[in-house]
Amino acid sequence: MDAAVRQQARERMKGYCRVCPVCDGRACAGEVPGMGGLGTGSAFRANVEALKKVRLAMRCLHRAVQPNLACSVLGLDLALPVLAAPIGGVSFNMGGGPVTEADYADAIMLGCRDAGIIGCGGDGVGDVIHECAFESIRKAGGHGIPFIKPWDGEELNRKLDKAAATGCPVIGVDVDAAGLITLRRQGRPVSPKSPEDLADMAARVHGAGCKFMIKGVMTEDEARIAADAGVDAIVVSNHGGRVLDHTPGTAEVLPEIVKAVRGRVDVLADGGIRDGVDILKMLALGAQAVLVGRPFSTAAVGGGRDGVAAYIEDLRAGLTAAMTLTGCADISSVAPHILA
């Protein structure tokens, strides 16, 4: 990422994020609200450390010199297998300085659209968060995925219906936000959902003509529950280490989850992904695409729409190089055999 964008983000996010040279959760342990991990920060660090342990087998005797990064996930054609993760709450998570919630949402949605991928919109306390995300998706011509928190009662249904009205192709619920401390502190009712609740949500979203994905699956049994409930895609995620301390890293649990529901739902993953090499590792472990969170926040706060597009170009270049040096001609050829 451009040094000037990082420095601008560091100044604007002072007191909320240090924009460390290596974003591994060590300096910001316990800083929630903010951009850190909950408690000791162990789960945040586990995401980074789990990916760090994955090794790639370098191959240089092949014909894969111009790999094709394009893929299709949830029926969406993407220039590379990346989505910007749903993050909201600029004022209490990022500081942001002059960057408003609307500015942030526009930077993510429009920057991602410009680069041929898709951004996800956040939700939270205060209608401004989801309203700005919804409006940005509308500005992008429906090119975005709104995520809704697992609210209790009618609020969940109301927001699902409003999300569908943006013209989006997919709606998500980050079920792991049931443990988000920023919501608990503000007395907002979120809760875990039963299999029956999940099936009801899937039916409501499908009835609106959208596909349905959930974020926050960390076990094989819950992946099967999601598939049985009619969910179209799951994101293997521990919410960036922000909801439960001492969970494993997502890269540790991803392969078995993929094995449990292969062919039934699309499987995506997030957690500690910073560059193109990290993307390739997650794909080799079985993910069909990845969500990237904190670096997109840095890019959006520090550089706006152009900063987001430039960061995506960094990811594209890094993934191209990594695929070339592991002999992968296209995304479909990425498999566990490239792991050392």
What function would you assign to each model-found segment?
Residues D2-A79, V334:
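An N-cap/entry alpha-helix motif that binds or orients negatively charged groups
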Residues A43-G126, H130:
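N-terminal functional module of multi-domain proteins
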Residues A85-E101, I145-E154, C210-M218, R274:
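Active-site mouth loops of central-metabolism enzymes
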Residues L110, K139, W151-A269, G276-A299, ...:
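Alpha/beta enzyme core
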Residues V128-E154:
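Long, hydrophobic, well-ordered secondary-structure blocks that form the structural core
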Residues A289, S297-A300, G304-L315:
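C-terminal structured "cap/appendage" subdomains that terminate the fold
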Residues A317-A340:
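Charged C-terminal helix
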